[in-house]
Amino acid sequence: MDMQNCTLCPRLCHVDRTKNYGVCHASDKVEIALVSLHQWEEPCLSGTNGAGTVFFSHCNMRCIFCQNHEISTEGKGFPVTIERLAQIFLEQQTRNAHCLELVTPTHYVLQIIEALKLAKKQGLSIPVVYNTSGYERVEVLEMLKDYIDVFLPDFKYYSPDTAKEFSHAPNYPQVVKEAIDKMFELVGKPQFKDNIMQKGVIIRHLILPWYYKESMEIVKYIWEKYHHDVYLSLMNQYTPMYKALTLSLIHI
């Protein structure tokens, strides 16, 4: 896989990112929007010191209700070299972050792997968390097997119609199921040290207004498939933002 024929995500744009943009609107140069110690992630990630988040610019999902649309859709951020990215990873460890959390990393996987190689050679040892929409290719996840400790995927939609309406991705439900299967295969059951997750999968689901039955289907699926072998993070902080402000169904 390379930037001149990009197939990193299920959109399969086949675009030359050195010259043009695909659905995610990202070039071949890594851009990041925010580096922080995040206190409000799941407690087993944030702990007392915070999760060392690195927010990447752009996104392959482009959900119409995105609460980070300035970063994901409008592309707020600045370019960094792979060497500088590796330094940022190490700086998060120096700040006593409990983990290094890569937020919306899918479209920069190739560069992130190179940066993680450099950082690990220089002593990066905290768990690396892959915070993703869940819209991932199994082949790309396989490339991450030696670099990611905790997968933090969304499971946004159960229905193809809902996925099409809100993210223009009708294949999302099938894709995310296969992706989570692969994530679990790669990291296995949850492992903890001092109440901080060292290995495992945490599945997030944001409950959308009027779509509670779909949420119930997702919870049922996760339980029947994984039982106690993954963690489920149900989120109720939906706020109508971005394009959702014009849609009566989810504008409350």
Predicted feature residues:
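Local cysteine-cluster metal-coordination motifs and their immediate loop/turn environment
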Residues: 4-17, 21-25, 57-68
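Conserved Radical SAM active-site core
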Residues: 26-146, 150-151, 159-160
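Conserved radical SAM core fold
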Residues: 72, 109, 134-137, 155-173, ...
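Generic structural signal for well-ordered alpha-helices
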Residues: 89, 113-116, 141, 180, ...
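Hydrophobic/aromatic residues located in beta-strands of well-ordered beta-sheets
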Residues: 128, 151, 201-203, 232
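Aromatic-anchored, glycine/proline-accented short structural segments
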Residues: 138-194
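Conserved strand-turn element in the central/C-terminal portion of the radical SAM core barrel
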Residues: 167-169, 180-214, 218, 236-237
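Conserved small/polar residues in nucleotide/adenosyl-binding loops
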Residues: 250-252
